[in-house]
C-alpha cells in the first residue's frame, strides 16, 4: 500500500504525543512540542488537527479504519460477534503501549467518548440492536473490560474475555 504525503504527515504527528508522553505529562506537552517532534511546523499541525486531543481521536480512528478494512462481514449471530470481539481485543493487546500512556495521562475518557460515538453510529446500521441505550452498554463493557485488562498488562486470554463478553450480550 502506497501512502500519500498527507498520510505520512499525519502518521508522524500521531506518533509524537506517544513519544513525548514517555517523558512528559500530556498537559505539559504543547502543540509546538508535538509539531517539533513530528518534524512539521505548527501551521501543518493545525492543518490536520484543531487541538492536541484530536491527535488521540485520529489515532483511534486509524485503528478502527484498519480494523474495518480487515473485517469481511457484518455480524449477524453470536459467533460473528465473538469473532469481532476477539479481533478487537487482539488489536487492543497489540496497541497496549499507547493505551498505557493514555491511561497514565488520565485521558481514557477520550477513548470512552470515542467508543460511545462509534457504537451509537453503528446502532443505526445494526438491525439486531433494539434498545436505544444498548450501544452505550456495549461501549461501556468494552471500555471497562479493556481498561481493567490493560491494568493487568493484558495478561488474560483473549478467548476468555471474548467468551465472557459474548455471554453477557447473548445470555443462554
Task: Give names to the regions the model predicted.
Residues 76-116:
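Helical hydrophobic small-molecule/effector-binding pocket
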Amino acid at each position: 500500500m502506497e501512502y500519500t504525503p498527507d498520510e505520512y504527515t499525519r502518521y508522524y504527528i500521531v506518533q509524537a504525543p506517544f513519544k513525548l508522553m514517555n517523558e512528559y505529562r500530556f498537559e505539559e506537552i504543547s502543540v509546538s512540542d508535538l509539531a517539533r517532534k513530528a518534524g512539521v511546523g505548527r501551521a501543518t499541525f493545525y492543518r490536520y488537527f484543531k487541538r492536541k486531543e484530536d491527535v488521540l481521536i485520529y489515532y483511534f480512528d486509524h485503528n478502527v479504519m484498519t480494523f474495518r478494512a480487515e473485517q469481511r462481514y457484518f455480524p449477524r449471530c453470536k459467533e460473528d460477534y465473538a469473532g469481532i470481539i476477539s479481533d478487537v481485543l487482539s488489536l487492543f493487546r497489540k496497541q497496549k503501549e499507547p493505551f498505557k500512556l493514555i491511561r497514565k495521562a488520565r485521558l481514557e475518557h477520550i477513548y470512552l467518548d470515542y467508543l460511545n460515538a462509534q457504537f451509537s453510529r453503528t446502532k443505526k446500521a445494526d438491525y439486531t440492536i433494539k434498545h436505544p441505550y444498548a450501544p452505550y452498554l456495549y461501549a461501556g463493557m468494552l471500555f471497562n473490560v479493556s481498561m481493567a485488562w490493560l491494568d493487568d498488562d493484558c495478561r488474560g486470554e483473549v478467548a476468555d474475555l471474548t467468551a465472557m463478553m459474548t455471554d453477557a450480550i447473548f445470555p443462554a
